[in-house]
Swiss-Prot record:
It comes from Bacillus cereus (strain ATCC 14579 / DSM 31 / CCUG 7414 / JCM 2152 / NBRC 15305 / NCIMB 9373 / NCTC 2599 / NRRL B-3711). GO terms for cellular component: cytoplasm. This is Phosphoribosyl-ATP pyrophosphatase. Keywords: Amino-acid biosynthesis, ATP-binding, Cytoplasm, Histidine biosynthesis, Hydrolase, Nucleotide-binding. It is an enzyme of class 3 (hydrolase). Disulfide bonds: none annotated. Pathway: Amino-acid biosynthesis; L-histidine biosynthesis; L-histidine from 5-phospho-alpha-D-ribose 1-diphosphate: step 2/9. Belongs to the PRA-PH family. It catalyses: 1-(5-phospho-beta-D-ribosyl)-ATP + H2O = 1-(5-phospho-beta-D-ribosyl)-5'-AMP + diphosphate + H(+). It is found in: Cytoplasm. GO terms for molecular function: ATP binding; phosphoribosyl-ATP diphosphatase activity. Pfam families: PRA-PH (PF01503). Its EC number is 3.6.1.31.
Length: 107
């Protein structure tokens, strides 16, 4: 799975460095951070709707859209995928206690 993410991120970085005229990825880069963030919000809302509808196939598709748009944001912000993967590995297996987290209404 990690290789699929690496391949996707590599493609996004290539589009950023060598724009293709009809590329949706380049469209997002040309519109900037606000557009990318808006798309992430939209895709997250679509995941929520798919979950509420108990539509597993749609949840999978929408999650891929979330991953893609988040990877575009990482590239826009010049954050390496390896940095994110390192953090995932660092957190993997660690026990997190409920009391260690802030309440949602106080964020």
């Amino acid at each position: 799975m990690e290789n699929a993410f690496k391949l996707l991120y590599k493609t996004i970085e290539e589009r950023k460095g060598s724009p293709l005229p009809e590329s949706y990825t380049n469209y997002l880069f040309s519109k900037g951070e606000d557009k990318i963030l808006k798309k992430i919000g939209e895709e997250c809302a679509e995941v929520i709707i798919a979950c509420k509808n108990n539509d597993k196939e749609e949840v999978v598709k929408e999650m891929v859209d979330v991953f893609y748009h988040c990877f575009v944001l990482l590239a826009e912000k010049n954050i390496a995928l390896e940095d994110v993967m390192r953090e995932v590995k660092e957190r993997n297996g660690k026990l997190s206690r409920v009391g260690d987290r802030r309440e949602i209404d106080t964020l």
